[in-house]
From Swiss-Prot:
Zn(2+) binds at residues 183, 246, 263. HAMAP family: DHQ_synthase. This is 3-dehydroquinate synthase. It comes from Opitutus terrae (strain DSM 11246 / JCM 15787 / PB90-1). Belongs to the sugar phosphate cyclases superfamily. Dehydroquinate synthase family. Its EC number is 4.2.3.4. InterPro entries: Dehydroquinate_synthase (IPR050071), DHQ_synth_AroB (IPR016037), DHQ_synth_fam (IPR030963), DHQS/DOIS_N (IPR030960), DHQS_C (IPR056179).
Length: 361
């Protein structure tokens, strides 16, 4: 039997359904929508479509679907335009509904498609990666990348529901699973000491008995941040704390063209850089930084860049980050392991030192 967690946003509240196998739950939702005369359109990627042929048929039947090439490159204006043409050809009207079936890239892209088509139609998330399950499928952030930066074009558009089925992780490559663990580690560093200690005792894997509970726990933490500060407008802290490691990580992704590091891998390096920044600001000690490095490495994630990147390129990319305020990058720093704050008056030379310490040249 599935269990449910509600993201409480008043009249825009929605359920997150958890089960090992959510195919019947999704199928029932699709049947309810189509019986009511609402057209369903499905967006996925070619890799998921190949690995989950049976699930696609079981959940969506004959509903039209469009598959994009896998990877971050799909979050593009070209993909967005292709999706618009697809929805037009399928004659999807304002009562139409989009389903995102895939990882974080598909969720971000399909959500933005739904936010934009006819000025906004309903959509549902059916995440198939650990990263999407614990983070990107919840909270309504949607968007695409442009050459100037990651997620610079997008919208806040909450889903009508999220279906999290851990059985989808059976076909997830080990590298993708590890990338998702970066976001799990993030929650432990932000404020869940028990979660951090669990991860330090033994790395989580697909067969870990704690996995389903950890996924639900991460979603509950994410929901709490979203409920308190949905549009990331709090002057300090708030939802922006979820960007721990992302200011450094997004710069790494942009400089490498989104094809070298998975998002979670870049965030992992970014969290290690953020720990070093926190130490330079007088918050963490060397033992704390070593703990961050150790839990990241234990989950088969990079602590440092695999090959050096040009420091000035990274700093330039950071300056274009969407979180910049008054020309200054905004960082999430750790006062201690389990407590974070936002800070936007970080001297550029400190950020540069942190990049060097994780492998920039």
């Amino acid at each position: 039997m599935p269990n449910t967690l509600t993201v409480d946003l008043g009249h825009r509240s929605y359920p997150i359904v958890f089960a090992a196998d959510v195919r019947n739950n999704v199928r029932d939702q699709v049947a309810e929508l189509t019986t009511a005369g609402r057209k369903v359109a499905v967006f996925t990627d070619e890799q998921v479509a190949s690995a989950q042929v049976g699930a696609l048929e079981a959940m969506f039947g004959s509903s039209p679907r469009l598959a994009f090439a896998p990877g971050e490159s799909a979050k593009s204006l070209a993909s967005f335009g292709r999706a618009m043409d697809f929805l037009a050809a399928q004659k999807v009207d304002r009562r139409g509904v989009v389903f995102a079936f895939g990882g974080g890239v598909i969720g971000d892209l399909a959500g933005f498609i739904a936010a934009s088509w006819l000025r906004g139609i309903d959509f549902y998330q059916v995440p198939t990666t650990l990263l999407a399950m614990v983070d990107s499928s919840v909270g309504g952030k949607t968007g695409i990348n442009i050459p100037a930066g990651k997620n610079l074009v997008g919208a806040f558009h909450q889903p009508r529901g999220v279906f999290i089925g851990t059985d989808f992780l059976r076909t997830l490559p080990a590298r993708e699973f590890a990338a998702g663990m970066a976001e799990v580690i993030k929650y432990g560093l932000l404020g869940d000491a028990a979660l951090l200690e669990l991860l330090e005792r033994a790395p989580l894997s697909f067969v870990s008995p704690e996995l389903a509970g950890v996924i639900r726990q991460c979603c509950a933490l994410k929901a709490a941040f979203v409920q308190a500060d949905e549009r990331e407008l709090a002057p300090e802290g708030g939802r922006a704390l979820l960007n721990l490691g992302h200011t450094f990580g997004h710069a790494i992704e942009q400089v490498t063209g989104y094809g070298v590091y998975l998002h979670g891998e870049a965030v992992a390096i970014g969290m290690c850089a953020a720990a070093r920044l926190s130490a330079k600001l007088g918050h963490l000690g060397g033992a704390d930084v070593a703990r961050v490095d150790a839990v990241v490495a234990a989950h088969r994630l990079p602590v440092k860049l695999r090959t050096p990147l040009v420091l000035m390129d990274l700093l330039a990319a950071m300056a274009r980050d969407k979180k910049v305020r008054a020309g200054m990058p905004r960082f999430v720093v750790l006062r201690k392991l389990g407590e974070a704050v936002t800070q936007d008056d970080v001297p550029a030379e400190l950020a540069a030192e942190c990049f060097r310490e994780v492998g920039a040249s």
